[in-house]
């Protein structure tokens, strides 16, 4: 059973995972209802989520400085907090690429990838919710395996998307911009897997 002070860390992890999930859902909504003229407004909304996630991470790091005893190793708390924050940062990074690369229309491959990002963030959120019971949880290992499976699915989708992009598109600027966007979408899932593997 976690001590009262331990609950702070687990609640912070849950909040961070929830910010990632909120960011993923927002990105999915933006991409599925794509309107390039509304990206600036969307960036502001996404940045508010990212800032809240950053604040939560700083709270965890500040608490670590003064903590005498922690529920898990300090290094693991810091690393997990960083990975959770990086998921949200990467999701925001996808939106930035859509904006500053001036993408004017959405590609179906990107929608498939963003759907995988949402699923991985949702599963990561469930996994993190089990951490406070890590010694007794019957679901934790299952969530880790499922996240690893989703990451492999993202890798396969990424490879197909890149192949499709490079074999059907002749404009090098379009290839470059989508190459970068697909890569950032795949990074989001990679960091969800890092959370699972920590």
What spans do the regions from the language model cover?
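Cytosolic, long alpha-helical scaffolding segments
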Residues: 1-198
